[in-house]
Amino acid sequence: MARYRRRSRSRSRSRYGRRRRRSRSRRRRSRRRRRRRGRRGRGYHRRSPHRRRRRRRR
């Protein structure tokens, strides 16, 4: 019984844990990196005031 339980736990953890962690980590990392670079970088400061001014003028 001990061997069967150990195998079932290891398989369940490897299938669910690895797939969920890898899929979420890749998606979140790619999206967070792109958004953080744009907001902290050149585009965020220049784009935010321009968008507000254009909307008010229109």
Swiss-Prot record:
Subcellular localization, as worded in the UniProt entry: Nucleus; Chromosome
Annotated region (Disordered), positions in chain: 1-58
One GO CC annotation: nucleus
Alphabetical keyword list: Chromosome, Developmental protein, Differentiation, DNA condensation, DNA-binding, Nucleosome core, Nucleus, Spermatogenesis
Keyword Hydrolase found: no
Annotated GO MF terms: DNA binding
Disulfide linkage: none
Tissue: Testis.
Protein family per UniProt: Belongs to the protamine P1 family.
Record's function text: Protamines substitute for histones in the chromatin of sperm during the haploid phase of spermatogenesis. They compact sperm DNA into a highly condensed, stable and inactive complex.
Name of the protein in question: Sperm protamine P1
The species this protein was found in: Monodelphis domestica (Gray short-tailed opossum)
Gene: PRM1
